[in-house]
Amino acid sequence: MARMFYDADANLENLKGKTIAVMGFGSQGHAQAQNLKESGLNVIVGLRKPFDEASEKEWNAVIAAGITPMSVAEAAEAADVIQILLPDEVQARVYNAEIKPYLKAGNALGFSHGFNIHFGQIVPPAFVDVFMVAPKSPGHLVRRMYVKGAGVPGLVAVQQDYSGKAKDLALAYACGIGCTRAGVIETSFQEETETDLFGEQCVLCGGVTELVKAGFETLVEAGYQPEIAYFECMHELKLIVDLMYEGGMSYMRYSISDTAEWGDYTKGPEIIGEEARYAMYEALQDIQDGSFAKGWLLENMVGRPRFNALKRQNREHLIEEVGAELRGMMPWLKETK
């Protein structure tokens, strides 16, 4: 069974007196930095110096949160603990140019995703600790739950333990952002990276979007109205996922009709059959042997031509046009944003 840690297992004193630099102020960065500050820790934020309206707005948002913004290099030089929350595809470049030159013996490097460490894009020196604290929710929820006095579950891992206290630091960090209120599971950089990518590709993002599109297209091509197809294959998905999120698959099945449950048992395995499972296995192999990471890094090196083409192609799909029209009839959706 997985090993779990809670508030009682963590000691914030392990971070007291240290300067924590959070690199980035995006989804996770803004949440983690503010939570750490409100936990009584000394936090700074590393960003690009303002050069346009967007970067100036981000810089000012850090100031408005009562935190000192600095350039990434300045923050790295001032910090004892450096939490890198930049996009995967830019982390290595920024690390090599603006963080690595300022590392000192006994510093700690933190991450919330293991991509760059696991795939060798960032190779830390032997004289630093390397740990991961990965909240299992978007940043806005990390922040919202902390403010409510609660927290979101997370993962914790140690890749390199120079000081002999890397795990204590990781647990203190998890406590500082509120994750140990809910509980954190011990893992490894390899396990977190490979399972996270697999979940995104085969289920949460790639799997779900292709399943929804395939269902929508099947109904439309069979002569049904696109609006009806949208409701059946896209809109109602949230209702089912919310039930599973709340109480698992059994609770979802308890909550639906017997007709729907029978169709679930008998037709689901036909749709997600051996061919789909084999494709999942192949996707996992591509992740494990580094093929996916290599392809994604190369795509970024050449300016993302395929990524941008696929993004444009999917934005122009009929389901997006129909969905935008139907969501315009649902004013309550705007109230939840």
Curated annotation (Swiss-Prot):
PROSITE patterns: KARI_C, KARI_N. InterPro entries: 6-PGluconate_DH-like_C_sf, KARI, KARI_C, KARI_N, KARI_prok, NAD(P)-bd_dom_sf. One of its GO terms (molecular function) is NADP binding. NADP(+) binds at residues 25-28, 48, 88-91, 139. Residues 2-187 form the KARI N-terminal Rossmann domain. Mg(2+) 1 binds at residues 196, 200. GO terms for cellular component: cytosol. Keywords: Amino-acid biosynthesis, Branched-chain amino acid biosynthesis, Magnesium, Metal-binding, NADP, Oxidoreductase. Substrate binds at residue 257. One of its GO terms (biological process) is L-valine biosynthetic process. Its EC number is 1.1.1.383. NCBIfam families: ilvC, PRK05479.1, PRK13403.1. Involved in the biosynthesis of branched-chain amino acids (BCAA). Catalyzes an alkyl-migration followed by a ketol-acid reduction of (S)-2-acetolactate (S2AL) to yield (R)-2,3-dihydroxy-isovalerate. In the isomerase reaction, S2AL is rearranged via a Mg-dependent methyl migration to produce 3-hydroxy-3-methyl-2-ketobutyrate (HMKB). In the reductase reaction, this 2-ketoacid undergoes a metal-dependent reduction by NADPH or NADH to yield (R)-2,3-dihydroxy-isovalerate. This is Ketol-acid reductoisomerase (NAD(P)(+)). It comes from Syntrophomonas wolfei subsp. wolfei (strain DSM 2245B / Goettingen). The gene is ilvC.
